[in-house]
């Protein structure tokens, strides 16, 4: 902290520092020490929810709590305040004749934002509010800056994202959303563990970006003098573990993609990838539905959920539609018919579908049609399956129609929530697709991947038929907490 910082102190900050010094002069550490609580606000409210004022008086139960001072009122020899802990707020009632003059001075001089420990008797006020009638106050930590004026919630969005700690202090809805996020992740783990999956950890630093179509962040390893990338997916390492015989694995972790930011994209985000030996994409559809419904039930109950005013029937079986059928239903264009790339591009031109210069196959055009016409119609949970080989370099070809793959994506409210497929375990085919990706990269596709020869070698040792899945955790949390921007579910979103 610089000298300039102290020169800019306002009156409130100066007064708080003076109070800090006064505490030290009294032999009280302004920043406290270990303090043992017997309960938090939530436990007390639950335990005494049905107890009247008279019943509590007769019980004369005591409790020791601690938390941040959020409100304070009163004068003379009596004061009321609210202490906030992780579970919420609880009122304290402080009388000078109960705590003593010295102890009452600690309470009286405490500022909003300070941390206090309170011992006392559980009571209910005449207004019916559960409270602690203090018998002793302990100063635990001095806040040298005042809380934002409107401590019931910050209104400056920039401050909310840059100073999340202030948002958590002042906005209970935001605080609870992040508690819900944690619960969702815990429940996903619980579900997969119950299905016999093993949670593993794989490298964040990769020699070659792979497992997804995305632009990576590039860094340099000084000791080895080599360029490396932050992972854009965990897929290829997890499938190496399937080769190694682990059979059922998953990883929840951060993924990094050097791309644009919008309401549903952040450069670093959390995903889960799951791989199951001896399964295909149909099995993984069932698994995906189970994971998402289990997470939804754990935080929203077992009925439909409401997202931005729309009822989402997340509790019912998810719809399953082939990509070509979905396109045909909306546009009338039938990509089941054999056609040349030229014929496909002519259809795209007729329907005003934008095409990229690296598109070289009919499959690219089919995917462009889907993105242009179908995605925006997928409100209820829908599995779209049968993606073209051209846009699915790691998925196994469909044995009945090798133009398409045994792959699916889950869409809800027009957004993709999961991507999965029967994994490609033919090393010769895999190398060929990597080479096609490398060619697309040369033609200007920044998201195309290079060739991971080590992964191809791993496949040559044999990988059993396998189904794999990736789910974006952040988007799922957005859905289940009814928010519209990813920044509201990331504790510390990327900012300029």
Swiss-Prot record:
Q: GO BP, one example?
A: lysyl-tRNA aminoacylation
Annotated Gene Ontology cellular components are: cytosol
Q: Where in the cell is it found?
A: Cytoplasm
Q: Which residues bind Mg(2+) 1?
A: 409, 416
Co-factor(s): Mg(2+)
Q: Which UniProt keywords apply?
A: Aminoacyl-tRNA synthetase, ATP-binding, Cytoplasm, Ligase, Magnesium, Metal-binding, Nucleotide-binding, Protein biosynthesis
Gene Ontology molecular-function annotations: ATP binding; catalytic activity, acting on a protein; lysine-tRNA ligase activity; magnesium ion binding; transferase activity; tRNA binding
Which EC numbers characterise this protein's activity in its record? 6.1.1.6
Please list the residues that bind Mg(2+) 2. 416
In this record, what's one Pfam family?
A: tRNA_anti-codon
Name of this protein: Lysine--tRNA ligase
Q: Which organism is it from?
A: Streptococcus gordonii (strain Challis / ATCC 35105 / BCRC 15272 / CH1 / DL1 / V288)
Upper classification of the source organism reads:
Bacteria, Bacillati, Bacillota, Bacilli, Lactobacillales
């Amino acid at each position: 902290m610089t000298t300039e910082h102290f020169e800019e102190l306002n009156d409130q900050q100066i007064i708080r520092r003076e109070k800090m010094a006064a505490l030290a002069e009294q032999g009280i550490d302004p920043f406290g020490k270990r303090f043992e609580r017997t309960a938090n606000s939530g436990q007390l409210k639950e335990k005494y929810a049905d107890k009247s004022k008279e019943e509590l008086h007769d019980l004369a139960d005591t409790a020791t709590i601690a938390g941040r001072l959020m409100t304070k009122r009163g004068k003379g020899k009596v004061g009321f305040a609210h202490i906030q802990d992780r579970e919420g707020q609880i009122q304290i009632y402080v009388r000078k004749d109960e705590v003593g003059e010295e102890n009452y001075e600690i309470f009286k001089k405490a500022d909003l934002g300070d941390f206090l420990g309170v011992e006392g008797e559980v009571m209910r006020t005449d207004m019916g509010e559960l409270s602690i009638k203090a018998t002793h106050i302990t100063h635990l930590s001095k806040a040298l800056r005042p809380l934002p004026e409107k401590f019931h919630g910050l209104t400056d969005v920039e401050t909310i994202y840059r100073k999340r700690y202030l948002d958590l202090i002042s906005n209970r809805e935001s605080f609870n959303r992040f508690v819900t996020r944690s619960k969702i992740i815990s429940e996903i783990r619980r579900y997969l563990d119950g299905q016999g999956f093993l949670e593993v950890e794989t490298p964040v630093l990769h020699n070659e970006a792979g497992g997804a179509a995305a632009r990576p962040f590039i860094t340099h390893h000084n000791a080895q003098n080599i360029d490396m990338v932050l992972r854009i997916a965990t897929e290829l390492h997890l499938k190496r573990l399937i080769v190694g015989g682990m059979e059922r694995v998953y990883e929840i972790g951060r993924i990094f993609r050097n791309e644009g930011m919008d309401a549903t994209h952040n450069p670093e985000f959390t995903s889960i990838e799951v791989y199951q030996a001896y399964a295909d994409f149909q099995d993984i559809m069932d698994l995906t539905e189970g994971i998402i419904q289990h997470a939804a039930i754990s935080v929203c109950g077992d009925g439909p959920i409401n997202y931005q005013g729309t009822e989402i029937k997340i509790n019912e079986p998810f719809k399953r539609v082939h990509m070509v059928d979905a396109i045909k239903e909306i546009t009338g264009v039938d990509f089941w018919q054999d056609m040349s790339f030229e014929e496909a591009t002519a259809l795209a031109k007729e329907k005003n579908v934008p095409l990229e210069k690296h598109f070289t196959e009919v499959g690219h055009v089919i995917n462009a049609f889907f993105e242009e016409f179908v995605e925006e119609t997928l409100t209820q949970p829908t599995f779209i399956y049968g993606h073209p080989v051209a846009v699915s370099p790691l998925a196994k070809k469909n044995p009945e129609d090798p133009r398409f793959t045994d792959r699916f994506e889950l869409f809800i409210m027009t957004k993709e929530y999961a991507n999965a497929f029967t994994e490609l375990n033919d090393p010769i085919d895999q190398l060929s697709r990597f080479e096609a990706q490398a060619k697309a990269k040369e033609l200007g596709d920044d998201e195309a991947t290079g060739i991971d020869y080590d992964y191809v070698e791993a496949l040559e040792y044999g990988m059993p038929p396998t189904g794999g899945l990736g789910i974006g955790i952040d988007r799922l949390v957005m859905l289940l907490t009814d928010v519209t921007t990813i920044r509201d579910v990331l504790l510390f979103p990327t900012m300029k």
